[in-house]
Amino acid sequence: MNKELQPKVIFLMGPTASGKTALALELAEKHNCEIISVDSALIYRGMDIGSAKPSADELARGPHRLIDIRDPRESYSAADFRADAIAEIELIVSMGKTPVLVGGTMMYFKALLEGLSPLPSADEAIRAEIQAEADEKGWEALHDQLREIDPVSAERIHPNDPQRLSRALEVYRISGKSMTELTQTKSAPLPYEVVQFAIAPRERKVLHDLIAQRFAIMLKQGFLEEVTELKARGDLHLDLPSMRCVGYRQCWQYLDGEFDYDTMVEKAVAATRQLAKRQLTWLRSWPELNWLESGAEGNLVTLMRQCR
């Protein structure tokens, strides 16, 4: 189908604390749009404060799809997101509305836009088997195994990166094919006309200050109490993707007595700034992107003009 005849989908991307949610809510209220969250932290139930999840009032103004869909103990892959997001997009389009995908998890946006390689789902038994081998022989020995079966991935993955190394070995043991071989085939790209926007402050210092201010507000709202409740469950740990989210790890370590309160704040803010830096690095190389300045008047008008 000709792109101009396809239904429109809006991507609203940006670093953390850049004002994406506020602009998305304006879109939902003033135009015929529905919001889909593209955020790997917002998917988790019980992780509200530290993930800057939209408030009850904000959700009443503009409901967000794909938030609170997983327990923090559960995994959620880019492939899971792509399948869920496509289903939500199809539903919104069938209602005669425009989907607005809002967030900062660039890997999810990329998977949705370009498709994914047909990699097998995680297998906990094989993953445990690989971990046991690593405990016995060391990750260097497993990296040697990877070099034999998939030299391209071995060149790309460092021996001190156990998560990616384990995944590459897991893929081979499940499928009998290397990750390099499988990634040469991708699923079909998104069958819609996608109009893409990024929002960020013009000055880096402004973003850094916003991040520090927002973390201070999170602490006043009870972020430490939220992490205390998560720890008290007894089934969560710092190796889970949910607990690796910025802020959560540092609060957890503080509660474990690894460092004092001021150090926790410093580390959490620094980690969030690093996340924002990575997000901006992705966006600077993103093709066909329309840039908006955080807090600028007329962003909504500019966005809608570009979407015509």
Curated annotation (Swiss-Prot):
Reaction(s) catalysed (UniProt annotation): adenosine(37) in tRNA + dimethylallyl diphosphate = N(6)-dimethylallyladenosine(37) in tRNA + diphosphate
Q: Name one GO biological process term.
A: tRNA modification
What does the UniProt keyword field contain? ATP-binding, Magnesium, Nucleotide-binding, Transferase, tRNA processing
Ranges where the record places region Interaction with substrate tRNA: 39-42, 163-167, 244-249
Please tell me whether the keyword tRNA processing is annotated for this protein.
yes
Which residues are tagged with the site Interaction with substrate tRNA?
T105, R127
Binding sites annotated in the UniProt record for substrate: T16, A17, S18, G19, K20, T21
Top-level taxon: Bacteria
Q: What single Pfam family name could you report for this chain, choosing any that match?
A: IPPT
* Single GO term (MF): tRNA dimethylallyltransferase activity
The protein's Enzyme Commission number: 2.5.1.75
Annotated residues for binding of ATP: G14, P15, T16, A17, S18, G19, K20, T21
Which cofactors does this protein require? Mg(2+)
Family in the record: Belongs to the IPP transferase family.
This chain's function reads: Catalyzes the transfer of a dimethylallyl group onto the adenine at position 37 in tRNAs that read codons beginning with uridine, leading to the formation of N6-(dimethylallyl)adenosine (i(6)A).
Q: How does it assemble?
A: Monomer.
Q: What is this protein called?
A: tRNA dimethylallyltransferase
Q: Which organism is it from?
A: Shewanella baltica (strain OS223)
